[in-house]
Amino acid sequence: MHLLRLSCWAALALTLTWPVASAANSPTKPSGIASAAPCGELVATLPNVRRELCESAQLVPVARSVRGRLIYARDIVPTQPGLRVLVVGAIHGDELSSAAVALHWIRLAGQPPADTPQSIHWRFVPVLNPDGVLARPPTRVNASGVDLNRNFPTPNWQRDARIYWEKRTSRDPRRWPGPQPLSEPESRFLHEQMRSFNPQLIVSIHAPYGVLDFDGPSVPPSRLGRLYLDQVGIFPGSLGNYGGVHKGVPVVTVELPNSLRTPLDAEMRQMWFDLLRWATERLGPVATGGRTP
């Protein structure tokens, strides 16, 4: 009986433990933090998020922000994982609905539909920019004033990112790309996750343009729920440009229609099921070397 109990705990530890950014690129993974620790602040800040939903997400601390706030994540691993999918919310801190939708999707990922084969290893980072989310008022940029979605190391970043910021945005402080690529702990953490987790699909949740964007190989989804494909172009230092165009990893960018309100629960479910079916049909064979999962 004692050995059985030890085996159960070992299995649980393996489920919740996964590679994090190395010490050279990201703060050391915090330890001894209860999984429900962020829920008080998140429930008070995010739309359509109740404590029960947040606590059921079983978030695990994995990194720290500029101000030392914890960045949390959750892995959901099937019995026979094939496709690896990284889902990221709140890269921009004032897009509160993006974090809320990520939390709702964690619940749905743990309750897969019986008619859809499940061989997907999900990794969720619902709030990449906690300093921006928890600022009063929330801010697009992180605590250093950097737009994290312009801070990834796309080719010719040193030249193009600054020119784009100066010429195309008129030095908009909300879109400052930072002093150099990966200058921020939040972008370094996500960059390291792209290396260590090696996702075959990245889903980046934003707001408020109400469209579906796509970068990279494969045939993009035509719609997720009521969001239809409308490829808006790429920007120096963006996750879509870096991941989809430069690294060849499909990046689906979900642009919710409102930053402060989530879609209705039924709509979030439909978006999720559409994403799940598209990923299984279009990307499943890629993850299994050309074999149907």
Predicted regions mapped to residue ranges:
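Short glycine- and acidic-rich boundary segments immediately preceding or forming the N-terminal edge
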Residues: 22-71
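Bacterial N-terminal signal peptides
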Residues: 7-17
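Active-site/substrate-binding loop(s) of hydrolase catalytic cores
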Residues: 82-86, 96-231
